[in-house]
Structures are given as C-alpha cells and as structure tokens.
Amino acid sequence: MDKFVIQGGVKLEGEVRISGAKNAALPLLAAMILADTPITLKNVPDLKDVRTLVKLIGGLGITMSYEGETVIANTSTLDNQFAPYELVKTMRASILVLGPLLARYGSAKVSLPGGCAIGSRPVDQHLKALEALGAQIEVEAGYVHAKVDGRLKGGEVIFDMVTVGGTENILTAAVLAEGVTTIRNAAREPEITDLALMLIKMGAKIEGLDTDTLVVTGVESLHGCEYSVVADRIETGSYLAAAAITGGKVKTTHTDPNLLESVLDKFEEMGAEVTRGEDWIELDMLGKRPKAVSFRTLPHPEFPTDMQAQIMAVNAIGRGFATISETIFENRFMHVPELARMGANIQVEGNDAVVTGVEKLSAAPVMATDLRASFSLVLAALAAEGETIIDRIYHIDRGYEDIEAKLQGLGAQIKRVSE
C-alpha cells in the first residue's frame, strides 16, 4: 500500500494547473450513455474513480476510448444494462448510470454503491424521484432493479433534501421523458450546471440553470457532441490552502474564480492577498501566520463541505480560534484525531468543531480516512516540523490528479513510497 513521506516547513511558491473536476466528470461520463451518436468529453482528470466509471460503462457494451484527457463513447454497441457490485462497490457515483439507462433503454440493474464512508448518504432520494417519472423500482439482494413501460413520463419531483447525485440522476432521466419535468429543491452546484450545459449541447431542453428549480422538456433522442469538463473548484481551493498554511504564494491556472467565492472570502479573512483573473487565482499569504476563521458548510453557493477539512487544517496553525459547523454530512470530522496526533487543538461536539490555533504542528505518522480528509493531512504535513508519513493514500488518488508532481512543482518535499 502506498504512503506519502512529506518533509514539512517549506513555503510553497509557483504555479499549478488545475484539472477537470471529478465531481463534474463522473455525471458527464454517465450522461454519455444518452447519446445516440459518438460523443467526446475533454479535460477529463486521470483518477481512479474516473477509470472505474469508464470501465463500468464499457462493461455495458459501449465502445470507450480513453486517451490522455479525452474520452470518446459510442453507444451503438451497448448490449446490456447491468452495473455489477464488483465495479460499483468502490464508488458512489456509479449509481449515476441508473437514470440514463432507464431513460434510454427502459431498464437497468445497478448495484447499490460504495465510496467514502461519510455518513449514510442514502440513494432513496434518487429512487423516489425516478418513481415520480413512472419508473418501477425494486431493491433486492443489494441491487436496484428499475424498469419502465415505454418512455418515462414527465412529472413533478420535490427532493426532501438537497442532493447533488439525486439531482444529476433525475436530470439525465428527465431529458428523454415524455412531457415536462419540474425538479424542485434541486442542488445548485456548478457541476450540475456543467451537466445541464452538456445535455443542452446534446439537444436537451433545460431551464432554470443555477437555481433550485429545473424545468426539463423531454425530447425523443439526444445526439453526441464535444464538451470539456469544468475546472475542479475543490482542487483549486486545496492548492490555495497549501499556500495559506505554508505562508507561501501560489497561482492556480485553468480554473474559474466565480465557482469559489465563499472559500476565497475566507482566505481573505485569514489575511491572505487573493488576486483573481479570468481563469486564474493567486493567493499570497505574505509569509504571515493566517488568522483562524469560522464557517458553516452549506449547499452551493455557500461554503462547500468538500473544503471543510482543508480549511480546518489551516485553522490548526492559525491565530486565535474558530468554530466549524458541518451541516451537510454527519461523521465528517474523521481527520480530527489524525490532526491531533500532529499537535492540533480541536474539540468536537456533535457537528461542530472548535479549533484553537497552535504556532507549530509536529510530524507524526497519520492515516487518511476519506478523500478530502487526506488532503488536510497533506496540508498539515507541509506545515509541520519534521517528516510526516501518511498511510492509506489511495483515498487521495480518488480525487486529486498527479498530486505529488503538482506539489513538487511548488517546492514541496513529498514522495510516494510503496510498501
């Protein structure tokens, strides 16, 4: 099993190119199933989850080409609608093939998903929404069996809670449904807008982008197109956090500052100088120790839960104290005991964490528990005195492309070692 060995205490400086967003690439890949002519997706990040989903879609009989940052799919060769447990178990996003398969082919058998162990994250919202469009669904022996007689029928979908995956699944189903579908309490994440934009390019009719009410007028078929995955706002924020925690200066390129306003505001509150361009962001901590900042995670456009762990790590060496409230997922403070091993002073009570900044963190052996938590440990290690070893880094490979090379390019002393 691979580990990271990180020698801390180096100010990070330089430029880093941001990859396409994993959280956009996965629903976009699933939506390729809807195209009745070849479809090309560019700026695709080379990540384990992406490779798994490409393999899963290929397992449906679809001809997949994956070279560099480009995936091409030809659905004319599809010969089954079965997504097996062996592939689905490692990744929650595999449930996203359910909507497209059901909408285009009238049936699907998809294993219940796996992925990061953060809270329950149930798929019941997905299934309830598809039933509202006329799907007949049974869950048996760990599999979702879905079918529809003829086409799905447009209807009103009201989510009980904001669900990104649920919104994506119903959106990719509704585009081929008969009539009009209204999706209320829809998630507003940029990755959903990205999905809607590709679907529109394929011939879909969708209104209400960037709002919590999407109106979809179904069409009979969708064609292929060429589309590029939106920049990864979480990777962007993560590398800016690396500049903040080390007192350095980092410029992120090929990104979109408009997708990260709530996080950039917090960096400025820390005392960082943040400069924005059309497709770049630069953070200069001016060699200072950041001020600890309080925040509450909420659905977009508020502070994203996927940046909670990284900003907590910066707060750990901040001036003063801060309160962090996690309102999206339960059980998302699993990085706290590991940060504490490095000397962080963090008290957790329920869904709140109070971080009292310390001047220095110390190197220690630590263990990654989930995707974003693992980057928070990398950040802590970059700022700590001495050599930190981070175990179970397969979590980080699920969401960060080429992380060692990117950090090394900023001056970090990081290497991957295999046992």
From Swiss-Prot:
It is an enzyme of class 2 (transferase). Phosphoenolpyruvate binds at residues 22-23. Cell wall formation. Adds enolpyruvyl to UDP-N-acetylglucosamine. Target for the antibiotic phosphomycin. Its main location: cytoplasm. Keywords: Cell cycle, Cell division, Cell shape, Cell wall biogenesis/degradation, Cytoplasm, Peptidoglycan synthesis, Pyruvate, Transferase. The modification 2-(S-cysteinyl)pyruvic acid O-phosphothioketal is found at residue 116. It is found in: Cytoplasm. Its EC number is 2.5.1.7. NCBIfam families: murA, PRK09369.1. The keyword RNA-binding does not apply. The gene is murA. Coiled coil: none annotated. InterPro entries: Enolpyruvate_Tfrase_dom, Enolpyruvate_Tfrase_sf, MurA_subfamily, RNA3'P_cycl/enolpyr_Trfase_a/b, UDP_GlcNAc_COvinyl_MurA. UDP-N-acetyl-alpha-D-glucosamine binds at residues 92, 121-125, 306, 328. Pathway: Cell wall biogenesis; peptidoglycan biosynthesis. CDD domains: UdpNAET (cd01555). GO terms for biological process: cell division; cell wall organization; peptidoglycan biosynthetic process; regulation of cell shape; UDP-N-acetylgalactosamine biosynthetic process. Belongs to the EPSP synthase family. MurA subfamily. GO terms for cellular component: cytoplasm. This is UDP-N-acetylglucosamine 1-carboxyvinyltransferase. It catalyses: phosphoenolpyruvate + UDP-N-acetyl-alpha-D-glucosamine = UDP-N-acetyl-3-O-(1-carboxyvinyl)-alpha-D-glucosamine + phosphate. GO terms for molecular function: UDP-N-acetylglucosamine 1-carboxyvinyltransferase activity. The active site is at residue 116. Pfam families: EPSP_synthase. It comes from Acinetobacter guillouiae.
